[in-house]
Amino acid sequence: FGKMSVGSHTTDYNSLVVLTHFKGHTQGGFGGSNKNIGIGCADGRIGKAWIHTTPGQDNQWDIREEEFMERMTESTKAVIDYFGKQITYVNVMRNMSVSCDCEGVNAAPVVTPNVGILSSTDMLALDQACVDLVYAMTEAEHHDLVERIESRHGLRQLSYMKELGMGNDRFILIDLDNGGKRITAAEAVEALNELAESRN
């Protein structure tokens, strides 16, 4: 997109805090900050239709997976370009179903362990870190969510953000619960598993 139709009050503000429940998503594979902004800030009548619908088609849901990822990401880029450096992202990795919150009571049950809260001023780094944490879990823990991500081509969100220069896909995890210690995704998941075992 060269432009995006957003909610009418979006431009009333000069800064933005993006608070996102990280989880799976029916079309996006996963819903992180990119999905939250790209879909959440697009206005309902025009912007969301641009993202979901192939030009000339009446069916709102006919778009191919990767094209959907790219349109959603371009919608996000319009918003973050507007706010510039005055934007911060927070992803909450708790109660992660393969389904979006918008599905309500029809959402699939939660089967992925709670991880915690991640935050960054770099959206790509944040969404990449969340995905990496999911992949670092055991097969039993992440199977359903990874299957949802891969079957919907969800990783295209990350590669397209990088292509558009929307952040850095390399990151450092800093554990604030342990004095700001640097940890890997695998270490973060190990600590999570140890905590879960200690509660049993």
Segments the model singles out, each with a brief description of its role:
Residues F1-N200:
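Extended, low-polarity segments enriched in aliphatic/aromatic residues
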